Amino acid sequence: MSLIREIAGGPYALAAGPDGAMWVTLVHDGAIARVGADGAVDRFPVADGSRPSLISAGPDGALWFTRNGDDRIGRLTTAGELTEFPLSEGSAPFGICAGADGALWFTEMGSGGIGRITVDGETSGWASVGGTPSMITRGPDDAVWFTLNQGNAIGRLHPRDGVTMRELPTRGAGPVGITATHDDAIWFTEILADKLGRIPLDGALQEIDLPGKPHAVVADPSGGVWVSLWGADRLARVSADGDIETFDLPPGSEPHGLAFGPDGGLWVALESGFVLRMPD
């Protein structure tokens, strides 16, 4: 099954909700959209200039998202109830993920920090890492892993171990997207170097050439990863062995966020104004 829905406002990132719908940030309109299993679209205004960016399902059954434009974390229930939690001015939160500890972890691009927020809304600044931290994911080791877009490194944070950094071999790589796969590895994109990286928990860092300005990356439940090629209007599927298959999108699509839906289908946010479910 394939599905495409026109949604104005700059669809940027997606997450599957516990209600069987896909939830989408609209970065230009300051809103969140819900795409139901039947394809119906509902919009939930957030605030002008809020720039909702990344979104994650929380352990409390709500959707949590970063408000990069007005320094807040947002929480939206599946019933449409919105709550906001202010952060320090200029923090510019961006990436967010659910951690192993039952809290949400997020990056602060502006202040260079990694933050934590409980489902009750208690926020804390956990680490100052610099380097413009971008996206963040829970790793197979229950740490959170994140990209340092201007620091040219991958970071790992665990409350027990603190912060460790892995410098990238390619200078000026501009890492952005990051995800964990079931084979105990961390995958990440290098948008400025046209590469995809992989860090096995028990091995050395690897890089694969992947032209097209790779942006977001998501683990494929059947193995390997999917990558949005923002600069080429394509998607790429990369196997665990490094084999690459690409899929063309309409010109000017600007593919960004990727997420698998409750039905097992791959969904893509196209900043040009569409949300696409890829054919099975």
Curated annotation (Swiss-Prot):
Molecular function GO labels: carbon-oxygen lyase activity; magnesium ion binding
Active site as annotated: 256 (proton acceptor)
Record keywords, A-Z: Antibiotic resistance, Lyase, Magnesium, Metal-binding
Binding-site positions, Mg(2+): 254, 271
Any one biological process term the GO annotation gives: response to antibiotic
Subunit comment: Monomer.
Stored PANTHER family: VIRGINIAMYCIN B LYASE (PTHR40274:SF3)
Name of the protein described by the UniProt record: Virginiamycin B lyase
Lineage summary: Bacteria, Bacillati, Actinomycetota, Actinomycetes, Mycobacteriales
